[in-house]
Amino acid sequence: MTISPQYIWNQVLDRLKLRLNPTAYETWIASATVQTFQDNCLVIQVENPFILNHLQKTYYSLILEEVETIVGYPIAVKLTTSQEQNLRIVDKNKDNLSSTKLQNKRQQESPKLNQLNPRYNFSRFVVGPTNRMAHAASLAVAESPGREFNPLFLCGGVGLGKTHLMQAIAYYRLELYPNANVFYVSTEQFTNDLITSIRQDSMENFREHYRTADILLVDDIQFIEGKEYTQEEFFHTFNTLHEAGKQVVIASDRPPKRIPSLQDRLVSRFSMGLIADIQVPDLETRMAILQKKAEYENIRLPRDVIEYIATNYTSNIRELEGALIRAVTYISISGLSMTVENIAPVLNPPMEQITASPEIIIQIVAENFNVSVEDLKGSSRRREISLARQIGMYLMRQHTDLSLPRIGEEFGGKDHTTVLYSCDKISKLQKKDWDLSQQLSELSDRINIASRNQN
């Protein structure tokens, strides 16, 4: 007798309901539905990526245990989202799609689009008084690159939306023109590419790559300070693109004139277009950001909770959204209802980043990735160890004042170029990988807590 997928899942739900507190069950499990049971694999669909991420981290082993108990033998369980399911349905019926839909599908599969964070688009950017000009200028550049505001210089503190707007410009153009040469890079990536081309005697390839861009977007240009040869090469790249009517967009945490050791001619070039300043969002904008974030992640938030978080987290958007995730996670784990009284203990006061010891950082990263401290300090190239080591280097750069060579020493005598590569890689990955970004935020919180307790 063949057991139906629905029967299996109904039995699993009944067992999970007994093992979990009611709030956790209703929040994370109840809405999940069974899709198929083929080739010893049960496919379970959930509503959104946020729930998917939490289930995989927190409840996957429990679900697998109960499924195997019902079935009676080892099988695989795959968790998926409704968005992924819809994409598969579209693919199966592609012969019936209009030419417009086929074109959109091809655009979504563009390799350049895949390098961007799909959450960083114009529709998800909340406009307020402190970022209105930057948003309007970015949209104008996306619609008609090279005509107005060239270059566009986005200026603002950490976590205020500069990267969001830059990637939104790239996303907008690539959706319309998948084959356009739209390059979004960090200043460190530009520098690393330059160093590699010098070592490999391939400067012509480097120049051809960057100087044939239709739109060049360079993030964190403040890190060009003190790099004379990088400034020289970027100056000529800028001139070539600008003279050809191509668009250049630059982002920095400070205006051009305040970037130390920046060549005067670059200050002049960066200032010849529009410098759009982004300030800390006001209370109403912060509340709107939280509301939109909750809607996209399918989270129900009482208005007083939104107002409480928005009132207490004022520095930047990244901190604001991190507080929301902490509150939702705490409520789901504790089984409490979502009220100001229940979330206040974990959110108030806001977690401030403090200087941590290298030992604390390495220990927390090792525990998180289930590897040993010796693994992190060793030379193993196993994927899970290598990634954990790179994340450890990135976090050490964020939470300490150590130089790159000193960080390398803490990880078993690694070269400073290895540390730079690792930090740049994780910095770029977190901008397009929401799960990694949240993981880094959680690790930072643990590092801060451990450091505060040590002090």
From Swiss-Prot:
Keywords: ATP-binding, Cytoplasm, DNA replication, DNA-binding, Lipid-binding, Nucleotide-binding. The keyword ATP-binding applies. GO terms for molecular function: ATP binding; ATP hydrolysis activity; DNA replication origin binding; lipid binding. InterPro entries: AAA+_ATPase, Chromosome_initiator_DnaA, Chromosome_initiator_DnaA-like, Chromosome_initiator_DnaA_CS, DnaA_C, DnaA_dom, DnaA_N_dom, DnaA_N_sf. Domain I is involved in oligomerization and binding regulators, domain II is flexibile and of varying length in different bacteria, domain III forms the AAA+ region, while domain IV binds dsDNA. Belongs to the DnaA family. This is Chromosomal replication initiator protein DnaA. It comes from Crocosphaera subtropica (strain ATCC 51142 / BH68) (Cyanothece sp. (strain ATCC 51142)).
